[in-house]
Amino acid sequence: QRTREEENTLCEVWAEVAEYAARSGITIGIEPINRYESYMCTSAEEVLRFIKRVNAPNLSLHLDTFHMNIEETSFYEPVIAAGSRLRHIHMTESDRGMLGEGNVRWDDLFRGLQEIDFNGNLVLENFSNSVPGMAVAVSLWRPSKYNADELAKGSLAFMRKMTCEHQ
């Protein structure tokens, strides 16, 4: 359980970093990370609350569908709650594999993106243990069904299909 002091420190640091970045026209995206990797900012709601508290216009939300699958009860609601504060999304499947073959509710996510008129970055984030060192770096203990090229091509095709269906 985090303390009030930790929350205050987080806000002080974010405010200082945001002010420094703003001088160069940089927007910072804060990514909620699942509870197994962090105890601070594990959901979109928490990050948005801290962003509101810091009140820096160049702080934004950076979602990741892998972490959303663990921490969020919906793929739609966090997108709607973020609105224009959402600027960047890591697109990855629940098992870090091929988009569309896992548990991520892609239609809900893309419906939300359409409703907020999202114009930020959709970034493919696949991991294959065919890449040396990747298995240990991201805890991919089972063999990948696809090599890195197959994952990239198939997932990009899926993203394009979903984007076209939700315009």
Regions found by a protein language model. Give the residues of each.
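Residue-level marker of alpha-helix boundaries and capping positions
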Residues: 7-8, 100
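Surface-exposed helix-capping loop/turn segments at secondary-structure junctions
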Residues: 21-28, 163-167
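Histidine-acidic metal/acid-base catalytic patches
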Residues: 41-63, 68-167
